[in-house]
Swiss-Prot record:
The gene is recF. This is DNA replication and repair protein RecF. Belongs to the RecF family. It comes from Chloroflexus aggregans (strain MD-66 / DSM 9485). ATP binds at residues 30-37. Keywords: ATP-binding, Cytoplasm, DNA damage, DNA repair, DNA replication, DNA-binding, Nucleotide-binding, SOS response.
Length: 392
């Protein structure tokens, strides 16, 4: 899988940009704030419909963009993608929302097209599979559990259309169940038939949660094997990384979706009193976590910055291999400032891993001195200046 043509309009600091891309390694270099990271962000957004950097899509639209015929300004990302199952053209427009006086409102409107036909945003996910690494991804290792759950969800949503839809349904039911629990707590009065009132929500949440758990547990086993050996190669050490899934409910030995759903339903019933007192659902996929161990040591808690960054890199490259094994196509690998904070040995091992056949990789750097002559000869280069790409 690779992007052979990318077009941007009024996205971040890009006014207009059309570029043909090769299916190999592409190096984007130039000064800070030139637009290197924004180009990776555009590709990630097209693949996942979300920005890795912003909570509000309206800020994706270039600040001085002008709309047409009085319409609000918009950003446009379009790509022609080659895949094993056949080519596809993907397009997404992000349009600012304005009030009657022309002043910007919160949020933005998304318009999606697949092969020039209107589509839902959720249908875009998985059409183009990407793996993104940024300097802040060390938070996958030492940050809050929500970062690790989000990582698993983005990975699996790209691989499995049913996962992304089940996740959306789970989140909807969770919100409704929590609203009910919170309302009862605030009223300080419970209905006579609490179990009957919650029975439907318990059943629906458990069924959706069981599927999410089954897919997560399966993926963690595969990722642990893939990222484990990659960690050893990058670090040059003797020990492999081991990834452990920490469930917030007692799952016992359950691993299939049906058995996991039953374990969740039992957990909800067992925690009924505590949930009513606190006004929230206390266990389930929305409260789970991952732990990263090397030689029995939790490096999320006790690892050095270099070790944690190496884990994050190994996790991302392992994710790319998982996508290739499961989907038959290697995803597009997006590496932003990947060499910072790595010593020379780790850099050498990492660059050897990046230069792989049938793998389109886009990586950014501020200069070329960090790369070997062999790497520079093998990679296609673009100099990035003020939102423009120049070959060479």
């Amino acid at each position: 899988m690779y992007i052979h043509h990318l077009a941007l309009r009024d996205f971040r600091n890009y006014r207009r940009q059309d570029v043909a891309l090769s299916p190999t390694t592409i190096l984007l270099y130039g000064p800070n704030a030139a637009g290197k990271t924004s180009l990776l962000e555009a590709i990630f957004y097209l693949a996942t419909t979300r920005s890795p950097r912003l909570s509000s899509d309206r800020d994706l639209v270039r600040w001085d963009a002008v709309g047409e015929a009085g319409a609000p300004p918009f950003a446009r990302i379009a790509a022609d993608v080659e895949r094993r199952i056949g080519p596809v053209r993907l397009e997404i427009l992000v349009q600012r929302r304005l009030d009657d006086g022309g002043q910007p409102l919160n949020g933005a409107q998304k318009l999606v097209r697949i092969d020039k036909r209107p589509a839902r945003a959720i249908d875009l996910i998985g059409q183009l599979r990407v793996v993104l690494f940024t300097p802040t991804d060390v938070m996958l290792v030492d940050g809050p559990p929500a970062e690790r759950r989000r990582y698993l969800d983005i990975t699996l949503s790209q691989l499995d259309p049913h996962y992304v839809r089940t996740l959306a349904y789970y989140q909807k039911i969770l919100l409704q169940r929590n609203s009910l629990l919170r309302a009862w707590r605030e009223q300080r009065r419970l209905p006579r038939n609490v179990d009957a009132e919650l029975g439907y929500w318990d059943q629906e949440l458990a069924a959706a949660g069981g599927y999410l758990l089954a897919e997560r547990l399966r993926a963690v086993v595969e990722l642990s094997a893939l990222a484990g050996s990659i960690y050893r190669k990058i670090s040059g050490g003797e020990h492999e990384l081991q990834i452990e899934y920490i469930a917030s409910c007692d799952l016992d030995a359950a691993r299939d979706a049906g058995s996991l759903a039953e374990r969740l339903r039992l957990a909800f019933a067992a925690q009924r009193t505590d949930e009513l007192a606190r006004g929230q659902t206390l266990c389930g996929p929305h409260r789970d976590d991952l732990v990263f161990n090397v030689a029995g040591v939790n490096l999320g808690r006790y690892g050095s910055r270099g070790q944690q960054r190496t884990i994050a890199l190994a996790l991302k490259i392992g994710e790319a291999e998982l996508m290739q094994q499961r989907g038959g196509d290697a995803p597009v690998l997006l590496l932003d400032d990947v060499l910072s904070e790595l010593d020379n040995r780790r850099r050498m091992h990492l660059l050897d891993l990046i230069l792989r056949p049938q793998q389109q990789t886009l990586l950014t750097a501020t200069n070329l001195s960090d790369f070997s002559a062999d790497f520079l000869a093998a990679a296609r280069r673009f100099r990035v200046e003020d939102g423009q790409l120049f070959a060479g």
